[in-house]
């Protein structure tokens, strides 16, 4: 996601990781890792990657360093701010993120992913519905959460857990 999309707030809500969280861009300067437990005995590692900016594939905003970390992941969550105060329109934000990934390395866009609308507790209904409709139209997996209030968080964790298990099973059958 872009800076201030709620990435650090989400990792703090779903794991024991305690990244610095503040209301200004680029609070996260290095990736934060957190172990997420779900179910009785299952878990997966999440990475809070510093925010992408337009031109990241050209090195803007430390883009190369951040994009290399994304390359190591097996499943992506595109976090999109749908709050009243979001600086970007949500569909434009998502499309810019996908463009940056494709421009850095086309194979990144073939990774399984889901779109996550964030900041539901202070949402703009118009922005939320625009992103939801876009995802429905393109058949992209879509979730909406508030990490601050935990609305939708448990459902998202279960969904990601199932996706990670599916990726792991695919890797096991290929070896």
Describe every region a protein language model picked out.
Residues 24, 145-147:
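Cofactor-binding loops of NAD(P)H-dependent oxidoreductases
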Residues 36-43, 64-144, 154, 158-171:
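Conserved C-terminal guanine-recognition region of P-loop GTPase G domains, centered on the G4
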Residues 1-60, 64-76, 80, 157-161, ...:
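Conserved G1/Walker A P-loop phosphate-binding module
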Residues 150:
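N-terminal, positively charged regions that mediate nucleic acid binding
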Residues 173-175:
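A short, charged, Gly/Pro-tolerant segment at domain boundaries
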């Amino acid at each position: 996601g872009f800076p201030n999309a709620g990435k650090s707030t989400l990792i703090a809500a779903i794991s024991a990781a305690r990244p610095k969280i503040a209301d200004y861009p680029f609070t996260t300067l290095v990736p934060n890792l957190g172990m997420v437990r779900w179910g009785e005995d299952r878990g997966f590692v999440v990475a809070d990657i510093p925010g992408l900016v337009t031109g990241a594939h050209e090195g803007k905003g430390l883009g190369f360093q951040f994009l290399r970390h994304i390359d190591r992941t097996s499943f992506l969550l595109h976090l999109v701010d749908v709050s009243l105060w979001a600086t970007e329109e949500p569909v434009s934000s998502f499309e810019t993120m996908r463009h940056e990934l494709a421009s850095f390395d086309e194979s990144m866009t073939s990774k399984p992913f889901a779109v996550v609308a964030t900041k539901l507790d202070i949402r703009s209904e118009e922005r939320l519905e625009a992103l939801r409709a876009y995802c429905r139209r393109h058949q992209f997996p879509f979730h909406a959460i508030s990490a601050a209030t935990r609305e939708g968080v448990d459902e998202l964790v279960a969904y990601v857990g199932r996706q990670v298990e599916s990726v792991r099973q695919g890797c096991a059958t290929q070896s």
